[in-house]
Amino acid sequence: LPDKAEARLALGLVPDKPTVFIFGGSLGARSINLAMEASVEKFRQAGIQVLWQTGKNYTPNSALNAENIKIMQFVDDMRTNYAAADVVVCRAGATTIAELAIIRKPAILVPFPQAANDHQ
């Protein structure tokens, strides 16, 4: 992975600020997006910057645009986003869990309630 500070600079973030990367996959995750909407102000007050990948089916309220929040519909470069993050909040998909394990990144995993045979 790239260096954390370099990754943050490349993403237009402050290099020495705590950073959370939040995503729900290419389509996004409604529950994650709604939780993020409700948390924007708390992140700002805590001095935490957020990389928020919403998915292509979600458009956040323009009032959620804050200097500490970078909103993206889709992420092409997961490596840089992973590198920039201190912690990741995401769906508990098998590929994502494998990626997080390989890079040893702390994560909060959100189960997908409609997963076939409860495979989460």
What are these regions (language model features)?
Residues 2, 18, 111-113:
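Proline-rich low-complexity regions
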Residues 1, 52-53, 115:
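Short flexible/disordered coil segments
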Residues 100:
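Donor-sugar nucleotide-binding helix/loop cap in glycosyltransferases
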Residues 74-77, 112-117:
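Short, acidic/turn-prone active-site loops that include or flank metal/cofactor-
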Residues 1-2, 81-82, 118-120:
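Short, charged, surface-exposed secondary-structure boundary motifs
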Residues 6, 11-90, 97:
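Donor-nucleotide binding loops and adjacent catalytic segments primarily
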Residues 86-87, 104-112:
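Structural loop-to-beta junction motif characteristic of Rossmann-like glycosyltransferase folds
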Residues 88-94, 115-119:
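A general structural motif
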